[in-house]
């Protein structure tokens, strides 16, 4: 015999919507849940809206079951009083779900990383400067492999001196990607025709003395969540394998304007999670039986293997830091609101950030200079200067370090303590600091989970989530479904607590300009992604098996110049970033 809900034609998606409206999850009796589940895929054609249905009736018993999740015990009288309101609200929820909302539409509520009363932020009125490429004495390498591993800062002078051509570099990048991608699975699609056209144009312009930027003529790769007309933008998912977008991502437009040459769209973990996509698992060039980590998997792997001088990745929670660590490249996660996300897949509107992944901190600065700043299309972007030059000094910088994280037992402790000695050898006076720990920072992850579930809500409700690559407990399909049970009040409260966290972090960082931190030490990765602070992650040694470890430098809001200056000085003293994976050297 069907249950009352099943008898009213409740399908799985409507049922999830009903329960989430109540904040109902595990408290629901298992039999009721099982009875409500239809056969997957039987009643829905992808992309075709569902026919209107009469909303199911919420009963006092359902409210009673929901109280465990919402944390609010009620009396019978209170439940009876609520019933009409809750049922009326459910009708509205169903109406909202019938509206098709593209992934590119931002919520009306916008995150601002600058807390009230924040001090010493760069003045918007200051003149923005463009970095000079600098004079790096470089001769043309004798082998193609040596040429492939040169940095952006080294390639620029060679191009301008016409000791190498953009067409040669572009063909070298394409050849290496074709050769090594079967081992690395880092490429989704090559943009060969576009790249060769751009390279020929760059060579003509350079020969005439028209130098657009330090990136002119240099090949690069885009994480495949950036829209490029004429090529699929797959988001790493079989569901979007053929997706063609007409718009051009702002970072692509800006790198085009800088004269850089786009040669490939690079792998990302499906919907920007991990290193597994519909083509397989992207590999770490230092250990090819190991994943590259993610979700900026392809950008890290392709750069580390000498297939590309640089790439653009993204970070919501570790997606630049983690693969940069695993693959031994240098990554810059900018301040939230520094780089326009127009034309980029949205995962979390209040946490997504785009940034460069390169061979060095200097290269990150050269790329960041080309892509930062407002475009009138992403309303979260600030107009703030980036006053930085290659080989900027660190005189006068106040350097802090996360004392507790360095002293705690963790796998890279020996490397991290050695980093303290290097920093002291640079003549810096280190100030011990601690990020706040009194707030439930881990619980704030529901902000990311809820926003991600909203970004891909149609996939969950249509039942197409069973076509996604991974179906594990921590993979997106299950996370998206689970997020339906996050109460709206808790989501708002989490954001209010986030504001409290932002104020506390701002108070701590007023005492310093840059903070050294173990890349995954303590709660710094989650905390600074929630607050929107910038970070550079760079190689800091190698494990016995030859795989890299990393170190992070955290900055104040809009403090990328200071972070890059310290990172550049550190790399000048260590040179870990110059090592090459032996199989690709």
Can you describe what each PLM-predicted range is?
Residues 133-146, 215-235, 393-402, 447-502, ...:
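Short helix-loop capping/hinge segments that flank enzyme active sites or metal/cofactor-binding pockets
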Residues 132-138, 333-417, 466, 573-585:
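A short helix-breaking turn/cap at a secondary-structure junction
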Residues 9, 30-80, 84, 101-107, ...:
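C-terminal segment of N-terminal export signals and the immediately downstream linker at the start
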